[in-house]
Amino acid sequence: MSDITKRALSASLKSLLLEKPIDKVSVLDITNRCGVKRQTFYYHFQDIADLVEWTCLDDASKVIAGKKPSSWQEGFLEVFNLIKQDKAFVLNIYHSVSRDKLELYLYSIVYRVIKQVVDEVSSSYSVSDEEKDFIINFFKYSFCGIVFNWIDKGMVKDPKIIVEQTSSLCSGLIVRALDNLGVKHN
């Protein structure tokens, strides 16, 4: 029951963000839209920033629990599509004091996508977990930078084109990084 209430509050917040910026949304607006009392909100969340963080983490967990992408390109495109589905929410959060919540959300999703690829490719290499984590984080920050730039410019450019351009630039880089750091087994 608790998650149902949290998701209802989250849906109310997202709905309100279609109408006004986050700094104009109050707890009362959210609870009225949701049909619950203010105490219910405060039972689950400390403040709106806490709800934003929970919403980001909940959305990320849905993606993480979903099907495994067949390639990093498919996973990266999935990230763009997820963001575009919640465009009003993402843009509002991106341009607010809660931007760090959105960044953590994106970092966790992109980390998962890159980790799957690195884990699969690195199985034939002798590389430490620390070295793999360095590679994953390198690509995570690179890819998130591209996503943040896209958000900053209003999400206008077609995500498929961005993924194709990124793929052209990054083709073979994970394998090359593993070649440079590890010993390949035949």
Which residues are covered by each model-predicted region?
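Secondary-structure edge/capping motif, primarily at the C-terminal ends of alpha-helices
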Residues: K67, V90-Y94, V121-S124, W150-G154, ...
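A short secondary-structure junction motif
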Residues: T55-K62, D86, V90, V113-V121, ...
